[in-house]
Amino acid sequence: MGVGIPAEFEDRFWSRHSNPRSGWTRVPSGAIIVYAVYRRNWRVLGAALVWTAINPFLFPPPETEDAWMTRAVLAERWWVREETNRTVGLGYPNICNTVGALGFVYALYAAWRQSPKKATLGVVASVGLKLWWLRVLVTHYDRRTG
């Protein structure tokens, strides 16, 4: 997660976040945040931000690693920790995550400017590219562990 984070906290975060319910219920968070900005609904925005922050701690660790989203979260941790990669960059597959993050910033800007089509395009690009990035990581992770 980052420098200075106690290992026990980091392990707890990743083990709980790897529950597929944690991963899949976070996927729409970006869209809800963009919607809240578009509607200028600060309560919804606050709730979505709190949800995004606490979500990984709300679910127990998964019983198995069979679910795709479980492997996606484990692959992300493996990619960053064991392979010493970053989550963004210009090389493949990190470019997917980088452009996806820029798509999310674009979506927020479009929402603020009250442009729903552009905001939707940004959200779809952001989520699609994040899932693409995860798909690539899962493929590498499955080869390594399989």
Name these PLM-found stretches:
Residues M1-G146:
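Short amphipathic, positively biased membrane-proximal segments
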